[in-house]
């Protein structure tokens, strides 16, 4: 695909264990995050993935060889699914990291508008708070909170990236192939666990996502014109 990848600050990933909350924009960014955390930082990532990915034979086989959790997003037993997410973090060793994509799906403009409209109907105050989002989707807090609560001793890392936008469909990937040389940038922001409120994690996550959105905007502007 002619992809050039810059990981700005992998040093903040060490030491582990960690819980990582990552932006999700494409079919490729989860693979790149695994490469950054595994090959560069020397950590062992385990992912919360949607169960639909089990239809991919490679992900089904490899995904089950690793301690990942395939989330059933249509389950009637939400508490059971959240318990499975929390369990992914409960036995993290010093070089382990658990990863979730709080947006729950690959972000694009149409999804963002649709989700904000639905949020306006259910929770107007939160919708107004998250209305400034221009790059990310409103985060779904339940899974992220479960993952963090499963490892209450772990610092949390917010993972951002740019350059993968437009790769959320196979058509988008083909267009990037035609462009040839594409640069992607990934960065991490580590937050000490004592700085994370235990009683208002959902509100904290919204604030972190608003901050990440501004970071993504700034990095996207910086990336323009870079060849």
Q: Where do the model's predicted regions map?
A:
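Short acidic-hydrophobic, aromatic-tinged amphipathic segments that line or gate anion-handling sites
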Residues: 7, 69-73, 190-192
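Catalytic core of membrane glycerolipid acyltransferases/transacylases, capturing the structured
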Residues: 18-77
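Conserved phosphate-coordination/catalytic loops
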Residues: 75, 79, 137-138
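Accessory terminal regions of nucleic-acid processing enzymes
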Residues: 195-227
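A structural micro-motif
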Residues: 3, 43-45, 154
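A cross-family acyltransferase "interaction/gating" segment
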Residues: 51-66, 93-199
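Membrane-anchoring hydrophobic helices of lipid-metabolizing enzymes
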Residues: 1-19, 24, 32
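A Trp-anchored, charged/polar loop motif used as the substrate-binding/catalytic surface
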Residues: 78-90
């Amino acid at each position: 695909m002619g992809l050039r990848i810059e990981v700005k600050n992998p040093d903040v990933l060490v030491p582990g264990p960690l819980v990582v909350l990552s932006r999700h924009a494409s079919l490729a960014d989860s693979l790149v995050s695994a490469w950054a955390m595994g090959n560069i930082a020397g950590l062992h990532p385990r992912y919360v993935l949607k169960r639909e990915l089990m239809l991919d034979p490679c992900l089904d086989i490899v995904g089950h060889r690793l301690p990942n959790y395939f989330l059933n997003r249509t389950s009637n037993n939400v508490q059971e699914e959240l318990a499975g997410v929390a369990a992914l973090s409960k036995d993290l060793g010093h070089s382990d990291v658990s990863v979730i994509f709080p947006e729950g799906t690959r972000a694009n403009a149409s999804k963002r508008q649709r989700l904000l409209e639905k949020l306006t109907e259910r929770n107007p105050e939160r919708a107004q708070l998250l209305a400034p989002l221009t790059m990310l989707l409103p985060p779904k807090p339940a899974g992220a909170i479960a993952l963090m609560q499963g490892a209450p001793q772990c610092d949390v890392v917010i993972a951002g990236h740019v350059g993968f936008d437009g790769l959320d469909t196979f058509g988008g990937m083909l267009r990037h192939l035609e462009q040839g040389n594409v640069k992607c940038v990934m960065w991490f922001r580590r937050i000490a666990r004592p700085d994370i409120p235990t009683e208002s994690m959902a509100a904290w996550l919204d604030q972190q996502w608003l901050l990440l959105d501004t970071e993504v905007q700034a990095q996207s502007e910086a990336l323009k014109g870079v060849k």
